């Protein structure tokens, strides 16, 4: 039996810049969603989703009902801050899924990705837990949002490492004024500093588009699904395969293609799910 899957990414996408990271609405996660079902259930899902879209047709923009219909300020406190109309919309949306649905979600920290790239040549050892080192750096950046460190992140890996070392040194000094609460953090930061003083810094960084598809391939294997198609929301120049599609193929996925969401309800469903 063949299965039909549809892919979309959050509008946050892979964008990481100084204004987004220091902004109040910054979200560190890159999200991707792939939804699907057996091909013989396609018509039933399409009918349900079209009925959902027609119910909320007054919210459509350019002919599509998009996840952006729910504004960020409605989600400041999660479901608690949603108005009744949006609670109803979300409930109706999830009602379009049933026990025949397959849902795969992928989430990655954008800053963590950059840190992993810088330390990709380092592994755990009896002397250092590199996973803990990476975690400590990501947590420090996301928690304190040091402008000088974040700004350097978009210049070069070498400048980023230098700025991070300065920040950690200053943070350790400040923490010594309250060691009762900050002793554990200082221990972690001192370990990170030791690594940074000896790290072989790469010349440049580039986003890897493969991770979400490697995970999805494992998802398919776990479900015993061999015959399938994956349709990806088209991005970039017409007639040119996007990096997303190329990465899906390079990750081992078969029968992949991309298309405009306005022509495929499954892509629109994935968009509503991933936000």
Cite the ranges covered by each PLM segment:
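Phosphate-ester processing/binding pockets and catalytic centers
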Residues: 1-275
